[in-house]
Amino acid sequence: MVENISLNVTVKSSARKNQQQSPALSVKKRAQKSQDFDFQFNVDKPKVKAIVVRRRAPPSKVEPTNSSVPNTTKSPTPSVSSSKSAISTLSASPKANASNDDLMFNVSPTKPPVKSVLGDDFMLNVTTKPVVAQKAKPKITRAERLGKKQRQGKPLTKLSEEQITRALKSNKKPKNPNQLPTPGDLFRAQLEEERRQKRREEGGGDQEASADEEDAKNNSGGGSPRVKPSSAVKESKKSSDIEDSGESGEESATSDEEPDESSAQSPGQEKEPKQTAKKPPKAEETSSTNRFRTKKIGLFDQSDVEALKQLGQRAVKPVKETIFTGSKISTLGLHPHAVKNLEDLLSIRELTSVQQKTIPEVLQGKDVLVRSQTGSGKTLAYALPLVELLQKQQPRIQRKDGVLALVIVPTRELVMQTYELIQKLVKPYTWIVPGSLLGGESRKSEKARLRKGINILIGTPGRLVDHLLHTASFKLTKLQFLILDEADRLLELGYERDVKQLVEAIDKQRAECEDKELPQLQRMLLSATLTSQVQQLAGLTLKNPLYIDNSDEAASAALKSKDGYQKETIEALLEVDDGLGEYQEDVTGVLSIPENLQLSYVVVPPKLRLVALSSLLAKEVDASPKQFKAIVFMSTTEMVNFHHDMLNEALTRRVLDEEDEQEKGDSDDDGDIPLLQGLRFFKLHGSMTQTERQGVFRGFRDCASCVLLATDVVGRGIDVPDIKLVVQYTPPQTTADFVHRVGRTARAGRKGRAVLFLTPSEAQFVRHLEKKRIRIQQGDMYAYLQTLLPKDDEARTVQEAASNLQHKFQTLLEDDRELHDKSCKAFVSWMKFYSTFPKELKPIFNVRIAHMGHFAKSFALKEAPSKFAAKHAAPKAAPPTNRLTYTERDPEKIQAQKRAKRRFTTTVSGEVRQLQQRDVGAQKPGAPPPKGGFIGGGVGRSSFMKSLGKSRALNMSEFDSGLPPEGAAKRRKQA
């Protein structure tokens, strides 16, 4: 028979819009609630918890109960398809199904399905799996996230200023590669300590307690936060924006003009009654309550954060050279006078390593090629055996023998230094005459000395070639010694042509000499770096030389395998490929630094370079005020001129000219103490006259506390005692230049320091030095800037002191038009220098990456470079030419030119008189003589020609004297 089936479904009606909706359950609560059976019937996503199907009696329309169903056998389980169709029917139209009499819905509280004890025919239970809560993603730190991106090769996101500030304020500091606190941490701690100290001095204990309470209140979230020292970065950023819009250089308002920060309230906080307090006097107010008296010039911004980065130091094994060996001079077998002279005049009793290796070989007459580090005594290594061999010759040499030893050096200062050393060495031997020839001196006096005779001649290549072509008494026939000192610098300065011409002239004169018993010519070449061009020069000048390397390890072990060089013998070295002909680095890879030299570099933002240099010098002067010598290397002549004038006027107030002397009394800063009081600045570069260069060089050696601003003209061979610091304000273009620059200090076993200035974009130059086995440490810029704070009464922080000093530089530049022009020229010359780095360093020193506006600020300029660069970028005028630049170098053609010029000389010679008589004879009879009275114009009877008849010679200076013309010459009485 057909039985009616009753389906009891428990549903949960959906909430309507007008009804109040129940709050949504969390994932965790929903997971707990899924243990009970619930039927949620939503239109969007129905969730079936339980379906119970029961059989009931057919005729009655009463609500079925469990008792009306007889307890029979187990009901058969319906098919899955029938259950699915029932569910789909219910979900499609639940209201239609509810109106059916056969199916009735009992909405009751949720209960778990229980099997009927009365025995139902069948029962269908459909359940769903409980909802499992999703696991939250594990949180990772920012460093792990960036590291994961870096491993996957994804681009790193750029941090905002708020993120950087939050990272700096957080307690989790990144680990330093050197396991040392970062400069930024030390700087912030120092600023916090200074703030507390200032507050303690100004307000006493009560104010300090109230300030601490306010700090605690701010930390808990009430009120506005107090201004912290780290906010100076944001203040300076705002000032940089003001400066870019053309309003830089203006002073910021004092604290009375600023709004009271403690009065600011949070949005939900009630406004407290304003407390009135007694105002201090005006003088007290300006001294104690002025919080930010900073000239807003925009020095500290995002680049300052970049400068705080620690680059770290790699493990580098430097090339070591032993300077002193412990052997005495008496062991060389020299003349007793020479040994005593060295002890008395030079205080030298012990030999250096290069001297011990070189002097015995030179005494045996061998050609040598010497490579040794700067300051190891190379000059004495060839000068001492040179004098010893000359004084041994019998019969004694005489002055009239001429030049027996020729020493070629690259610079005039090195000529003076070498000449003074040889003068001391030949003091016991009065018959040996040394002399020097260098550019800038009078040729006439040099010709006279050459005619008298010079036995040991020291000179620069240009002046030596000049006398070789134009001085008949300069003969090199009897030359016995040819020495080339600082050979690599000779080639860098463009003297290769002159050196080659000198060597060819020596060989030609010796070949043409009739005396067949000429002494053998001994040749020596010395350098601190062995470049490929030095090898080529050695091939031209040396004959079977002996290579002497002073490094502790063999130079062949340091050769680069990829270049294919094997330097087992000097012959293989000279037959090297021309592949590195223009490569100026040391091909042996041996770049040795003295062990007592402490190398460091400082990463300085471009806008802080001038201030950082001033603070560095101030710190060193404070450490040793009575005895301090330093050399600051710069790239161009214009930079040296500008920084010399700027630092003198701004930091020492030294009178430079008459106008400064007149304005000295009108200055408003007479009460202030200069930052570098007592320090003297010198400048030295190649464009100065010889008289100026000699005076500067001697003044720098004799001065106790001074700084020399110079180009690379003093980078080679200059030996000035007691130089404590070398600053490379602009980076060198080659590693060899770096080695020679830092070699001006820590000479002959003394101690010294060298500091290299780099910008954040140039920091990878350190890795380039480390590849060359040069160990260098990173210095702290803020350690130098802190020196400015005690010397600035208006500044409260280091940033304020640095900004005030920069403002002082800019104000001085605005008031002095001449100094402003020098600054513009210096900046343009620096731009040209920066674009000429070699190919291998172009990625590090890239002119396209450099921010020219920031670099212009290091020259105290406020204008954009585009406004003045075109004006000062015009090509320079041609330098004054000498006889080597515009005359013929062939001696025969030179003599022909001299004979042609005699016709136009002011000396009254026979040719001139014949020319005058011919011109007078060619004049028409009766015609008046032309005005002017010039030679060759047919004016034989003019006053000028009559004056020539009385004088045998006239100098051109007599015509340019500016004196009034003399009266007409008196006529002679006729007999």
Curated annotation (Swiss-Prot):
Residues recorded as bearing Phosphoserine in the entry: 75, 99, 210, 220, 224, 667
Reactions catalysed: ATP + H2O = ADP + phosphate + H(+)
Gene Ontology terms describing biological process: ribosome biogenesis
Record-level Gene Ontology MF annotations: ATP binding; ATP hydrolysis activity; RNA binding; RNA helicase activity
Bias-annotated ranges (Low complexity): 64-94
Keyword Hydrolase attached: yes
Transmembrane stretches, start-end: none
Pfam family, one: CTE_SPB4
Top enzyme category: hydrolase
Name of the protein this chain belongs to: Probable ATP-dependent RNA helicase CG8611
